[in-house]
Amino acid sequence: MSDTRPTDRETACFEAGIKFGSLYHQFAGTPVSPGSADSLATAMEAAIENQPHCDEVVVDVHEDRLREELADGPADYTELTGKFVDVDIYIDYEGIFVHAHMRMTEGYPLMDVVEVRE
Amino acid sequence: MSDTRPTDRETACFEAGIKFGSLYHQFAGTPVSPGSADSLATAMEAAIENQPHCDEVVVDVHEDRLREELADGPADYTELTGKFVDVDIYIDYEGIFVHAHMRMTEGYPLMDVVEVRE
Amino acid sequence: MSDTRPTDRETACFEAGIKFGSLYHQFAGTPVSPGSADSLATAMEAAIENQPHCDEVVVDVHEDRLREELADGPADYTELTGKFVDVDIYIDYEGIFVHAHMRMTEGYPLMDVVEVRE
Amino acid sequence: MSDTRPTDRETACFEAGIKFGSLYHQFAGTPVSPGSADSLATAMEAAIENQPHCDEVVVDVHEDRLREELADGPADYTELTGKFVDVDIYIDYEGIFVHAHMRMTEGYPLMDVVEVRE
């Protein structure tokens, strides 16, 4: 019979998921341009690192993808969506380490657990 | 030696976490009053249920807590924060069922895995 | 010499702008599908109508545009952006009526004051 | 008979309002602490300055108010709300300059047009 209480590994993965959902839905829609990409990435990292059990957040806002998007239209900024960012999040929960990331996969920003270590 | 790949139970918990972070950071800050609480709760449920592996979302926006908050000031609406809502989320990932919830605990909106079942 | 204090008409237009920025940046990024479009539109209207001097908000989430977007990919939901919604906002500030709207124009969700009446 | 079309001054005020609503509802709810306040303020300024006709945005996240809030509880971060920030926005629309600001007034974050100049 499997236990219905979460293990520490499972709770650590739950915590990793919270950070991804928070980061994405807090900042999606933010006006962004090649010139403001760095300050946004820095703020996203520092904001989510405030959350419990969050060891490190690495956000890469791809200025080249922003430039490509803007080359086709009259505007000089767009809205942040998953297609412009890679994210890596590192959780430390009770000695369990979780690395999860977000990457564009077949046109969608997929969030996955990369590894769980004790 | 423990495996570093996530189990299905761990991935199911990760998915539950994503939904909580998404729900909270998408809707926190929304102008809300006793009269608009129901429509907001309904929209929050339907929005997050769109996400993958999300079986059901139950959002309770407490009109009594809104009324109490508003009784002390001149405004007739406030901004949505965790102190006004209870949330239950039910995940079904590859036959693993996760129930997680958000409840106010000592003044903070804590998100926890309630149970994991196969 | 022009006065530097805002007139009531100008303040009414400022209030209209606040409502548009609020609506757009609160709800952009929300997971949405043809099935959840109605509940989201209703919640957006009720939420923003809470704000001061806001007489009426009319949000039309275009289910046909959502269906067209989703026809091309593997997912059955997307994120709310301006290309899926028309918005009309009606302000009443000190007897000044402002009607403003958001419409897709050459690929961009433009927000404009339609009319100001006393 | 007053004209129902907006004047340039009125449109400039509408644009100022859009920026305030955008800034507030994009960033309200962001996890923030004294240590992350500066990076968040910088990102808010750069993000909103991307928007059309937006000359300058000045955001002051009050670290002292954050420290005071956090002194009473067990957490070392909170969520961004109006009570922690002052905002000044400067619009230049067709030669019309609008300065608007957000300040806490009797417990509420009020947004006002400070001056309109040609």
What are these regions (language model features)?
Chain A
Residues M1-E118:
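Short beta-strand/helix segments in adaptor/scaffold domains that form protein-protein interfaces
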